[in-house]
Amino acid sequence: MTAATVRGGTPRDSVVSVSNRWEGAGVNKGYAVYCDADPYFYDAPHRTADRTGAARSRYAAASSPVPEGWQRHESGDWLALRPADADLPAQGWKIHVSACLDNAESVLDRVWRHCVDGGTAFKFVPSRYLLHQRNAKYADRAGSGKFVTVYPADEAEFERLVGELSELLAGEPGPHILSDLRIGDGPVHVRYGGFTRRDCYDADGELRPAVSGPDGVLVPDLRGPVFRIPEWVDPPAFLRPHLDARSAVTVTGMPYTVESALHFSNGGGVYLARDTRTGARVVLKEARPHAGLAADGADAVTRLHRERRALERLSGLACTPEVLDHRTVGEHHFLVLEHIDGKPLNTFFARRHPLIEADPGERRLAEYTDWALDVHARVERAVAEVHARGVVFNDLHLFNIMVRDDDSVALLDFEAAHHVDEAGRQIVANPGFVAPPDRRGVAVDRYALACLRIVLFLPLTSLLAVDRHKAAHLAEVVAEQFPVDRAFLDAAVEEITRVDGSTRVDGSTRADETTRADETTRLDVTTRVHGAPDAARRPAGPVAPVRPDDWPRSRDSMAAAIRASATPSRTDRLFPGDIAQFATAGGGLAFAHGAAGVLYALAESGAGRDEDGEQWLLERTKRPPSGMPLGFHDGLAGLAWTLERLGHRDRALDLAELLLDQPLDHLGPDLHGGTAGLGLALESLAATTGQAALHSAALHCAELAADGLPGGSVPADRVSRGRARAGLLYGGAGRALLFLRLFERTRDSALLDLARDALRQDLARCVRGAGGALQVDEGWRTMPYLGAGSVGIGMVLDDYLAHRADEEFARAANEIVAAAQAMFYAQPGLYRGVAGMVLHLGRTTATAPGTGPRAVRRQLDALSWHAMSYRDRLAFPGEQMMRLSMDLSTGTAGCLLAVASVLGDAPAGLPFLPPPRRSGGPLTRPHQEP
């Protein structure tokens, strides 16, 4: 139940002006598991069974009658059973049992009988599909392998059950659960943690599952991919041999010294190492048995052997690494490969791309085009050489292409490779390169090469998961921006959009025999980015029904798409949005990703109130979800503020009363979920209702938000809690916004001083990049965005400068404008994409060049590059762009609000950041200008 805001970016060693915008080339693997349940929207994985053949994979035990005197509860990925009179502790030692796909049902039947006969509470993953998903290559490593959880009543029963289950399941294979201590070499594991759900805030103000320490104070129950025992817990003596055995297995006996980790997945790690015998650098690829499953069920060890066979067949080619060694340590397998000295293509070409600049010249565009075409030709030749040796690569994408200093290329990661005589489909894939399921053999590689033609110029092919015909639009944009031969792009579009189930093993096709690709029934738990039902068969035409700058048609179209997506029968969410809806209690209601933010955007943009949606929210807030955070973007404060804004004062005040009853000193100081957001909401409610208690609470929030500032009054033991962050949602800018709004209410200049100090803290975490653009430096990447980047700081700087002149701040505000002027941003969203740039450029009072209507129009045009269609209405993709989103933070509602801020008759704005007063009315519609 973490307040998850997914963050991405490229490495900090990239050129500053590049790294902040190229995160679309990176992939947050956590999103993939939310793609199976719906072809258009992210949804909870357990809902997949409602629309696919996954329901047939449900274990018989999941449908068995509830034993007499027992209670049954199914939630998410788990089905729990417990005796009605069970008296379990809140925390303690619990037992996890792992299993493979083939023995899981047998393991479950035995554990079920043992627990029911003994009156022991337990829960289990109820279907083969969900178990496959939990053990997939890029599933959450902290939860990987967990199939059955058993809850002993005390330590004596814990020891007894560990022994009995170990004997009962002796010899059964199962993956090692990384978060647990393994008992012997079987599938039984143990861990100390919470039995019942309790929550506390961690050092960063994030809500986490909790256990209580010896003093009764709740602390985070750490659930990472590493076995940990709380420092106050003494493990039972019978665990000592297993703890010793765990420590005994190391790689010290191998003639390789690990220098750094390059990558982790459920299947194991990839490490940069050095051969101690020769001093040469090598790459170690680790594989864990029964873990890291691909779509075909192959585990990491099976795929490692596939890679070894493929690379040995390709030995001698300059475009593939040599196999140097193969080792086994315990049950872990290691493949030792030649180290290719170069950089992955995603980072290499990002340094060169001209669209990250505000105004690249013709020469710059031409030079980049020549380089990109040369790289594609080299990759195409490399793939042809691989095919000539009888191997299909089957996983070509930017991260698997290494570019050396001389621009020669090498292909990496052959774990999905197979012989050309096998008509194999993709079993692992990058979302931007997922071939349709009708492609087999070398046709998979040809599809990836076609995607690469577009990605080298415009890395937005993840959108093809929703509609493959988006390729034609992307090609048009590329042709408009770069001097590239249109035939080069047309060939890519033809390959991407064709529908041909008759693809032969050698990749040839029969053009006169086309069949519809069934993109909705492929149960693929690794790629999870199948297209929408009409993605392959829809006739060519505009992917988006209207341009964003065609106002008010675009407003009406976006609003219609949002309303068409509503699911009022659901209790967890009304509008589909980011996966964060499922990470926090009440996430589907909250302002950032839930109904509150969407309803706000509809009302503020002039699209009209959604009375049915408001009634849905009122019904769900009669009794807010247990464990819902308190914050503005993620919790109760945002709900209270939104309902007051929409005219539902009684419910707003009910929620405000809940806030007043809660201790707040454990919260972080930020705007997203901390005291800055609470203070702003409470002060706004105080102003509209006249309730003095709300104003007093807002002032208390300001005191807490002053944590760590020179003028703050918070005790020293609370100063500088958590990691330092900058920006509107998580940094000093959000706190400064609270101080500014309270200053406007009280005229207390000390609050203005606090705002100054908070903004200075944020500016101290910024760096200047190419063109003088000021961006937040996170240590390994830089960020220009509205939520966690410099543009959000610029919004608050503008408001501060309205009250007090400051030369340093005025200069910074102008430099931040440059961060909002690039020609390309990887995502469209409000807080992490183009929409935020539109909103800032339309609102800023900075005087730097690039703040006028022309700059806004250019970003509106860039926003159109991401535009999609949902039921023939304008919609936008969410985070990672594998599915559409309707929420405010990442999706269509946020884009609607941003466009309304510059084109609406009554300009819209973010909460607490009102739009500027414009004497001349809305911006001239770009499509109406000469």
Curated annotation (Swiss-Prot):
Binding site for ATP: L262, H263, F264, S265, N266, G267, G268, G269, V270, K285
Biased composition (Basic and acidic residues): 501-527, 547-556
Superkingdom of the source species: Bacteria
GO term, biological process aspect, one: peptide modification
Record's GO cellular component terms: plasma membrane
Induction (record text): Expressed in substrate hyphae and very immature aerial hyphae. Expression commences by 24 hours after germination, is maximal at 36 hours and has disappeared by 72 hours; expression is higher in wild-type strain J1501 versus M145 (at protein level). Requires bldD, cprA and ramR for expression, deletion of bldM or bldN increases accumulation of RamC. Probably part of the ramC-ramS-ramA-ramB operon. Transcribed from 23 to about 40 hours after germination, requires ramR for expression.
The protein's enzyme class: transferase
Any matching Pfam family: Pkinase
Free-text disruption phenotype from the record: Deletion of ramC leads to loss of aerial hyphae and sporulation on rich or minimal solid medium after 4 days growth. Deletion of the ramC-ramS-ramA-ramB operon on rich medium leads to an initially bald (no aerial hyphae) phenotype; after 4 days develops a substantial aerial mycelium. Wild-type mycelium on minimal medium. No expression of SapB, normal expression of chaplins. A complete chaplin-negative plus ram-negative strain (deletion of ramR or the ramC-ramS-ramA-ramB operon) leads to the complete loss of robust aerial hyphae.
Keywords of this entry: ATP-binding, Cell membrane, Kinase, Membrane, Nucleotide-binding, Serine/threonine-protein kinase, Transferase, Transmembrane, Transmembrane helix
Biased composition (Low complexity): 532-546
Phenotype when changing K285A: Does not restore aerial hyphae formation to a ramC deletion
Segments traversing the membrane: 447-467
Residues annotated as the enzyme's active site: D395 (proton acceptor)
Enzyme Commission number, as recorded: 2.7.-.-
Domain Protein kinase: 256-516
Similarity section: In the N-terminal section; belongs to the protein kinase superfamily.
Free-text function comment from the UniProt entry: Required for aerial hyphae formation. Probably involved in processing the precursor of SapB to its mature form.
Protein name: Probable SapB synthase
Gene: ramC
